[in-house]
């Protein structure tokens, strides 16, 4: 049993340079999938002052005006003004996309199992790469996410809402939030110890105004009052000034916010990024499947906290390993849970794609404010439609 301790997670806004890159990569992916659900996409984006570079490997029958997709995405985020050092109408966009390597394609199109004459059509697609992926759920919030990352995302969504609605017209698109939560010895969140918000702003607004607005209109409306007390510390724009931001302040790159995208460091991460990748890339699809499994396990009351690891070999359909850790919070054995997983979840790439309906243009909405625990959009891997099946499998094992 742990003693009382602190844990910190961060989130960044949709106007953060790395997140601009993620959103551009996923907007291109969505545009391809809209025309060609079978599109193979691995799309990486770099953004810097006045420039966007899009590279990667794409095999598709779709025709997409990539320049237009890039510019629309940037403008929608809020970079419409040349004085921000980056704007959707005037930045340069360089596109350098190749086809998927035929050596990779042959293993994805025709898995080891289907080459060895297995007749199951879901064995046809091999994993697009080797790798390991983690999914996680914990009963700290209604959406079964760790509290620090959940609060950090909510703060960032609120800041964006106040900016886009014009209520706080001095806000600019780039922002970051960080929340430190104090846990008791039973790993239950007790209070928020520290909140950090840094938000880009216009030249003529005072630091006092920003600090007051962030405290009253963001922090106190987002974080439940029972978590805040007179010892909670607030650091709002602690450098004193944040006028230069976005790609003018820092260059951005797809896949550099993998902890923000997942569990805020509260659970392990296999290292593979999500944005710009179609669902044959198990970095993305198997991470979604692992979250789906873990969330349904916790919702079914089989554990209060659950981490699922999946691992794959390139060109092979079946995962090479599936493991479960319930951190001694399980109501049944981990072995029983593993049996229930095998009975209820098809973890071959084609099985995951079918189970979660992943060949749709649904990805741009995941590219900011987290891929998991989202309450503002309907994501198939967040559904709790396997709870009864898991309970039934466990009941059957107990007879």
UniProtKB/Swiss-Prot annotation:
What does the record give as its pathway? Amino-acid biosynthesis; S-adenosyl-L-methionine biosynthesis; S-adenosyl-L-methionine from L-methionine: step 1/1
Write out the GO biological process terms: one-carbon metabolic process; S-adenosylmethionine biosynthetic process
Q: How is the cofactor bound?
A: Binds 2 divalent ions per subunit.
Q: Which GO terms describe its cellular component?
A: cytoplasm
Requisite cofactors: Mg(2+); K(+)
Q: Where does L-methionine bind?
A: 57, 100, 250, 281
Where does the chain bind Mg(2+)?
18
Record bears the keyword Magnesium: yes
Task: Kindly list the GO molecular function terms attached to this UniProt entry.
Answer: ATP binding; magnesium ion binding; methionine adenosyltransferase activity
- Which SUPFAM superfamilies has this protein been placed in? S-adenosylmethionine synthetase
Renumbered to this chain, region (Flexible loop) spans 100-110
Annotated ATP binding lies at 16, 174-176, 241-242, 250, 256-257, 273, 277
Q: Which UniProt keywords apply?
A: ATP-binding, Cytoplasm, Magnesium, Metal-binding, Nucleotide-binding, One-carbon metabolism, Potassium, Transferase
Q: Which PANTHER family match?
A: S-ADENOSYLMETHIONINE SYNTHETASE
Which HAMAP family does the record associate with it? S_AdoMet_synth1 (MF_00086)
Its annotated function is as follows: Catalyzes the formation of S-adenosylmethionine (AdoMet) from methionine and ATP. The overall synthetic reaction is composed of two sequential steps, AdoMet formation and the subsequent tripolyphosphate hydrolysis which occurs prior to release of AdoMet from the enzyme.
Q: Subunit structure, per the record?
A: Homotetramer; dimer of dimers.
Q: Which NCBIfam families match?
A: metK (TIGR01034)
What family, per the record?
Answer: Belongs to the AdoMet synthase family.
Name of the protein described by the UniProt record: S-adenosylmethionine synthase
**From what organism does this protein derive?**
Latilactobacillus sakei subsp. sakei (strain 23K) (Lactobacillus sakei subsp. sakei)
Gene (name only): metK
């Amino acid at each position: 049993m742990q003693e009382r301790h602190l844990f910190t997670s961060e989130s960044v806004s949709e106007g953060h340079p790395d997140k601009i890159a993620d959103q551009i990569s996923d907007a291109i992916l969505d545009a391809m999938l809209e025309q060609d659900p079978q599109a193979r996409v691995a799309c990486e984006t770099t953004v810097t002052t006045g420039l966007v570079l899009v590279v990667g490997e794409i095999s598709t029958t779709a025709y997409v005006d990539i320049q237009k997709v890039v510019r629309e995405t940037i403008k929608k985020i809020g970079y419409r003004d040349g004085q921000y050092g980056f704007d959707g109408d005037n930045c340069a966009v360089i596109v350098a996309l190749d086809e998927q390597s035929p050596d990779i394609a042959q293993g994805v199109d025709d898995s080891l199992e289907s080459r060895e004459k297995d007749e199951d059509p879901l064995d046809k697609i091999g994993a697009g790469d080797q790798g390991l992926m983690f999914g996680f759920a914990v009963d700290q919030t209604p959406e079964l996410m760790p509290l620090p990352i959940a609060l950090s995302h909510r703060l960032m969504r609120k800041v964006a809402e106040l900016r886009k609605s014009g209520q706080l017209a001095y806000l600019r698109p780039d922002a970051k939030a960080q929340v430190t939560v104090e846990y008791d010895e039973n790993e239950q969140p007790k209070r928020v110890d520290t909140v950090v918000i840094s938000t880009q702003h216009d030249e003529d607004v005072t630091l006092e105004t920003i600090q007051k607005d962030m405290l009253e209109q963001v922090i106190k409306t987002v974080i439940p009052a029972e978590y805040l007390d007179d010892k909670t510390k607030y650091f709002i724009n602690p450098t004193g000034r944040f006028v230069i931001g976005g790609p003018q302040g820092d260059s951005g790159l797809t896949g550099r916010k993998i902890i923000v995208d997942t569990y805020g460091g509260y659970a392990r991460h296999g290292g593979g990024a999500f944005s710009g990748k179609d669902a044959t890339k198990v970095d993305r699809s198997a991470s979604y499947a692992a979250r789906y499994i873990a969330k349904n396990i916790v919702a079914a009351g089989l554990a209060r906290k659950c981490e699922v690891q999946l691992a794959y070999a390139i060109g092979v359909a079946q995962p090479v390993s599936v493991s479960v850790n319930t951190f001694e919070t399980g109501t049944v054995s981990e072995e029983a849970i593993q049996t229930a997983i095998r009975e209820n979840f098809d973890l071959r790439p084609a099985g995951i794609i079918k189970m979660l309906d992943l060949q749709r243009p649904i990805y741009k909405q995941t590219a900011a404010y987290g891929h998991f625990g989202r309450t503002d959009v309907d994501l198939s891997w967040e559904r709790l439609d396997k709870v009864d099946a898991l309970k039934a499998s466990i009941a059957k094992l107990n007879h």
